[in-house]
Amino acid sequence: MIRIAYLLSQYPAVNHVFMLREVRLLRKQGFEIHVASIRPPDRDLGALTSVEHQETQSTNYIRSMPVGRLVAAHGYTLLARPARYLGGAVRGWRLAGFKGLLYFGEAVAVGDWMRRKRLPHVHTHYAATVGLLISHIFPVTLSITFHGPGEFVNPAGSHLGEKVAASLFSCAISRYGASQLMAVAKCTDWPKLEITPLGVDLEEFSPRPFRPAPSPFQMVSVGRLAPVKGQHVLIAAVERLAKSGHCFVLRLAGDGPDLRALQQDVHARGLSECVIFEGNLNQDQLRGLYRQSDVLVLPSFAEGLPVVLMEAMAMAIPCVASWVDGIPEIITHEVDGLLIPPGDAEALANAIARLMDDVDLRQMLGQRARAKVLEKFNLERNVARLAAVLRQRLPGDGAAVGR
């Protein structure tokens, strides 16, 4: 059995629910997965689903580690591997200054936990710098899943080439992501790259009843409330729809630093009656919201391979999204969804109005969207693809080569 440490930035988390699905399916595939999370869950335990709550019971939360355990981890590692320990501190400082020293401290905590559990390999999502330092200090191998888009904006500052070089292999969730890694990695490291798309559970996200004449028309947008997600463009677009006499409700699911500014924008435009802020929703609540929705809108300025699009499309909800980064790998314009130039409120309003006014188009795009997810973003099939990569790339027992 291959034994792996999964190092995640925050687990479970509303915005990273795909990680929970991936971990649980890999276990069903026969892998022994032990999860370490840098931060605790993003919600109180009472707001978690039963599955999420179950996962917290076996997860090692690094920033909640008792001080005594942390001191013991550092003391043991310094005595057992002094050169690697001190070299890890120096490398952390070089990578990210004072923040890099925090990453170094976390790396020692995770690496010592791996030593005690005899875990020879660490795979990381959203914690690649900590993973890099673990592989420097401890005799373990490293693999990384890169999501984007943030880390692709400043690849030198994110040290992407160095991380790919240090890894046994690295995964991109889209062809776009793989191209960005190829742009910064040495060509001799290109054979390390794998494309492992995300996916959704097609039974959990089954088609919702189609509504030919909704009143009001229900729109939903799901994602962190942050400037990069483009929600202000969506607010400007729906103002145009309101002025043209369309009857609708827009529900924004998510939370984030832009909440107050978005609320003020909605109020200033006189849209408070038709724009509702739902806050963070767990998966059960989100599926309920999808079932009430006639269209999903994702007006982002940058994206990796957004799972929210896959979820909505799996439920036969037509989608309107920005033509950026990995999104065209999910939606083919006017075949199984509509794509618009990022930042163009007029184009976004026109695309939504097309779906409001054309019942046949709305139904056709929803049906084709479901078919696209069945073909390319089936969760079990895509996790099986990742499992095949792990089996091919790791030794039979997952053991790392010592140093």
Language-model features: where?
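Aromatic "clamp/platform" in nucleotide-sugar-dependent glycosyltransferases that forms part
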Residues: 301
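A conserved mid-protein helix/loop that constitutes part of the nucleotide-sugar donor-binding site
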Residues: 17, 217, 221-246, 250, ...
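Short alpha-helical donor nucleotide-sugar binding micro-motif in glycosyltransferases
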Residues: 164, 280-281, 288-293
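N-terminal subdomain of nucleotide-sugar transferases
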Residues: 1-65, 115-116, 198, 384, ...
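Conserved acidic donor-binding segment of nucleotide-sugar-dependent glycosyltransferases
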Residues: 333-334, 338-345, 354-359
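Nucleotide-activated donor-binding/catalytic signature segment of Leloir-type glycosyltransferases, i.e.
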Residues: 263-281
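Carbohydrate-associated surface elements
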Residues: 176, 199
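Short hydrophobic beta-strand element within catalytic cores of glycosyltransferases
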Residues: 318-321, 331
